[in-house]
From Swiss-Prot:
Signal peptide: none annotated. GO terms for cellular component: cytoplasm. This is Ataxin-7-like protein 3B. It is found in: Cytoplasm. Keywords: Chromosomal rearrangement, Cytoplasm, Phosphoprotein. Belongs to the SGF11 family. By binding to ENY2, interferes with the nuclear functions of the deubiquitinase (DUB) module of the SAGA complex which consists of ENY2, ATXN7, ATXN7L3 and the histone deubiquitinating component USP22. Affects USP22 DUB activity toward histones indirectly by changing the subcellular distribution of ENY2 and altering ENY2 availability for ATXN7L3 interaction. Regulates H2B monoubiquitination (H2Bub1) levels through cytoplasmic sequestration of ENY2 resulting in loss of nuclear ENY2-ATXN7L3 association which destabilizes ATXN7L3. Affects protein expression levels of ENY2 and ATXN7L3. It is linked to A chromosomal aberration involving ATXN7L3B has been found in a mother and her two children with varying degrees of neurodevelopmental delay and cerebellar ataxia. One child also exhibits episodes of unresponsiveness suggestive of absence seizures and facial dysmorphism. Deletion at 12q21.1 deletes the entire single exon of ATXN7L3B. Residues 77-97 are annotated as: Disordered. It comes from Homo sapiens. The keyword Cytoplasm applies. The modification Phosphoserine is found at S92. GO terms for biological process: regulation of gene expression. Interacts strongly with ENY2. Interacts weakly with USP22.
Length: 97
């Protein structure tokens, strides 16, 4: 880069030079990070560590426990073990008919 005397520059030119330096530093940092992640994935030492979900105060959402797939008795696929209803259907009480 060529030598520039900073004493003779006005504020706008100094801000433009500072902005150019700032953008170059950010681009180099982002590109370096991308290369580090790519190398870690290729070499097999990149892994994501999932933290335990916190309480409601972290995100305002209750943590949901995975209880597995829901199996509805009338929605079984043909050929699956236990095909059909698991229990007998019950009629509703006479006052609701």
């Amino acid at each position: 880069m060529e030598e520039i005397s900073l004493a003779n520059l006005d504020t706008n030119k100094l801000e433009a030079i500072a902005q150019e330096i700032y953008v170059d530093l950010i681009e180099d940092s982002c590109l370096g990070f991308c290369f580090e992640v790519h190398r870690a994935v290729k070499c097999g030492y990149f892994y994501l560590e999932f933290a335990e979900t916190g309480s409601v105060k972290d995100f305002g959402i209750q943590p949901v426990e995975d209880k597995g797939a829901c199996r509805l008795p009338l929605c079984s696929l043909p050929g699956e073990p236990g095909n059909g209803p698991d229990q007998q259907l019950q009629r509703s009480p006479p006052e609701f008919q």
